[in-house]
Amino acid sequence: MTTTTLTLAQLIDETLDQLYYEIEKPRPLLLGAAIDASQTTLTVASNAEVATITDLLEAGSELMLITAKTDDANPTFTVLRGYSRTDAVAHAKNDVVLVNPYWTRSAVTRALQRFFTGAAPVWLPLIRAEMMNTVEYAGVGQQLIPLDSDVIRVLEVRYQSPTSGRVVNLPGWRFEDNLPSAVVSSGMGLRVPSTVSPSDDLLVSMSVRYAWSGSGEDATVDVPAGCEDIPALYAAAVLASGREVSRLELDRLTEQSSEQAARTGSNVGLIRLKWQEVYRRLDEARRTISVPRPLVYRRFQRGA
């Protein structure tokens, strides 16, 4: 499977572009001086009057709550660092600080992580193919191949002839996902028929979990090629609606009146449009992903 590597910062920016119109973006300020992760006071370069006590500041992915403000010409703000489960980090002079953002980067990050841990493995299977053989795992039995802990299911097992190189489907294999840790540390393994020789090469196709590499907004994740925009579309739709909306609910989701929109605190029509776009792109992307389907082999009964 061909994949594309995306960064968390890139996905957050794309999600915010889906949520904000240009005129709706929060007011930016510039830090007047560098601050470290433990400092609780800060200044801004200009326009300090737009921020006051109880306002929320966002610097990078960190949220800071203003608890006090001096009356000077260039006021000093006292802030609560690492507000709302964010990490306090150092910031340089002239770093951009947003005042009262409606959609925070930390909230977008949680929506993206929800997509990759829940919906993505089901909607957009990430397929990994590896060449394996049982000779490497003789210590746990030559008919059992241990698998990594990120494997969700085995989709296909094929045999490659060592002489002709021909690849054919192998019958009689079984994916074991509840093995004792004393046998396989990950608890998962591939059991192959006894006809397989320890030196035979097996081409195993597996559906695996999405995994982040790195930390912070520099973390990267691989997604199937052609699906690069779907994580941001999903995160924007979840944040706009407050939860995931199923296809069945879309058929019944209508904005009956402005009174209903005011009561729910959201634009029902906009929510419907966002989820329609998510499912439309999912349908398009899934047509480009070839997922191997396990072949069903039935034992031939003599005399039947």
What are these regions (language model features)?
Residues 76-84:
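Catalytic Cys-His active-site segments of thiol-dependent hydrolases/isopeptidases
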